[in-house]
């Protein structure tokens, strides 16, 4: 019999952390964070990182493991998560993976293609070429070498377009060709849950309420400190996290406070929409309604 591993997925502000803490207190579980924002040190308020009190109730693995100046890929996450899962199982406990970064869950569950690591020099060349000729021209280049990826990647998505070209220039193979080969899938009995409110308006209200609370907790001060370091910028993955980008732009004088709030809430709602889109097509998923009384009992039943 394969060891059991639990996934608890869901959109932002859906109540994942609260439910995970309840389960950790009532069952022999250890929590592994699956969140591309929580990995960064010093990004606590805007990422809704669990508080000191919450971490005392249920410690989270894979938070505060990178500086905001550093990158962290789905492959990095998969390697780290597999090591944590193995350690938790050796302790006789059940790994509980909690978060909303669906690409991380997918990488862990299905394995990853052997893509080359980022090359800063090639990325700089691609950016310089885009500055000179425009991303439309680079998209035409991608269409010539990888029409399948070009169909999927929009010319106005420079991050993914740049990565597809970078992969080809490093390896001589297209992104489509490389992604046809994947590493081994997860060798465990995985039970997957998703939690979300039944009504979209409820989730939208929760997102707006949570951002207001973040502002009251000192979110602008947090971003001000990050900005003052001098080594961070908006092109870094850490500063592309929702909320942080909009607050940074506000501090740069691009728009006023009210516009910042409006843009940050809108961006977070768009993130939640993308997360739900992923989840609706996810196979073998057990749905829970946010705040429902029977959620803990349902999870504990599957822990046995």
From Swiss-Prot:
Q: What is its EC number?
A: 2.5.1.75
* Reaction(s) catalysed by this chain's protein: adenosine(37) in tRNA + dimethylallyl diphosphate = N(6)-dimethylallyladenosine(37) in tRNA + diphosphate
Residues binding substrate are 12-17
**Record Pfam families:** IPPT
Q: Name one GO molecular function term.
A: ATP binding
Site (Interaction with substrate tRNA): which residue positions? Answer: 101, 123
| Gene3D superfamilies given in the database record | 1.10.20.140, P-loop containing nucleotide triphosphate hydrolases (3.40.50.300)
Does the record carry Ligase as a key word? no
Q: Where is this region: Interaction with substrate tRNA?
A: 35-38, 159-163, 240-245
Known cofactor(s): Mg(2+)
Report the domain of life of the source organism.
Answer: Bacteria
State the UniProt keywords alphabetically: ATP-binding, Magnesium, Nucleotide-binding, Transferase, tRNA processing
Q: Which residues does the annotation say bind ATP?
A: 10-17
One GO term of the biological process aspect: tRNA modification
Primary enzyme class: transferase
Q: Does the keyword ATP-binding apply?
A: yes
Q: Which PANTHER family match?
A: TRNA DIMETHYLALLYLTRANSFERASE
Similarity field: Belongs to the IPP transferase family.
Assembly behavior = Monomer.
This molecule's function is given as: Catalyzes the transfer of a dimethylallyl group onto the adenine at position 37 in tRNAs that read codons beginning with uridine, leading to the formation of N6-(dimethylallyl)adenosine (i(6)A).
Q: What is the name of the protein in this document? A: tRNA dimethylallyltransferase
Q: What is the lineage of its organism?
A: Bacteria, Pseudomonadati, Pseudomonadota, Gammaproteobacteria, Alteromonadales
């Amino acid at each position: 019999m394969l060891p059991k591993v639990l996934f608890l997925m869901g959109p932002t502000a859906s109540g994942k952390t609260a439910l995970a803490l309840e389960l950790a207190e009532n069952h022999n579980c250890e929590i592994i964070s699956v969140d591309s924002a929580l990995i960064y040190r010093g990004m606590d308020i805007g990422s809704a990182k669990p508080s000191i009190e919450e971490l005392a109730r249920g410690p989270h693995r894979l938070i505060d493991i990178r500086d905001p100046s550093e990158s962290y890929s789905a492959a990095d996450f998969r390697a780290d998560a597999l090591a944590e899962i193995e350690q938790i199982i050796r302790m006789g406990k059940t790994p509980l993976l909690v978060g909303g970064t669906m690409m991380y869950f997918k990488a862990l569950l299905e394995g990853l293609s052997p893509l080359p690591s980022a090359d800063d020099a090639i990325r700089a060349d691609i950016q310089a070429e885009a500055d000179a000729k425009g991303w439309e021209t680079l998209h035409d280049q991608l269409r010539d070498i990888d029409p399948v990826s070009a169909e999927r990647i929009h010319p106005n998505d420079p991050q993914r377009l740049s990565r597809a070209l970078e992969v080809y220039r490093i390896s001589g193979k297209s992104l489509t060709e490389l992604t046809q080969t994947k590493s081994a899938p997860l060798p465990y009995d995985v039970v997957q849950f998703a939690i979300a409110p039944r009504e979209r308006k409820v989730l939208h209200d929760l997102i707006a309420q949570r951002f207001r609370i973040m502002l009251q907790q000192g979110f602008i001060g947090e971003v001000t400190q990050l900005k003052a370091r001098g080594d961070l910028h908006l092109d870094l993955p850490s500063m592309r996290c929702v909320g942080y980008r909009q607050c940074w732009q506000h501090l740069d004088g691009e728009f006023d406070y009210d516009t910042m709030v409006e843009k940050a809430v809108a961006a977070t709602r768009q993130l939640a929409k993308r997360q739900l889109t992923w989840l609706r097509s996810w196979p073998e998923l057990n749905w829970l309604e946010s705040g429902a009384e029977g959620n803990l009992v349902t999870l504990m039943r599957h822990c046995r």
